[in-house]
Amino acid sequence: NLTQFKSVLFGEMAKRFSLEKEAELFWQDERTRAKLGRWFFDRPRDLPIVIASASPEFELQSAAKILGVPRLIGTKCDAETGVLIGKNCKGEEKLRRIGEAVGAFEIRAMYTDDAKADGPLLAAAQEGYIVTHGVLVPFRG
């Protein structure tokens, strides 16, 4: 299954280099930052925002900091060993974890590059967008 595959993959990677450091370097790279959509930076600042991803949290910590997002929810993974802790954070599990982290919530706008994996979140959102190469396309379920 995907969770086992990710554990093996990250476990092998962790043997070769620091997963946290590599992720930090990736997000600090100007080429990576240049690919981030302007729409994100131009968003209304009065709404709470959460990054919720199937990626390991250590991969996105620097991104959350750069983007000014205070809440990050991702797949739990030991960055030293690469072993996943618990379930992969996608689909219904992602919805559950968001609720666990923030309590009762509503999704005003949902942005994703994977409509299939994030179907439950798109279905719960007032507005949904598919992001392709930084371009937003309204989701039509």
Where are these regions (language model features)?
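C-terminal cap/substrate-recognition subdomain and adjoining C-terminal extension
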Residues: K21-G141
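Alpha-helical membrane-targeting segments
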Residues: N1-E20
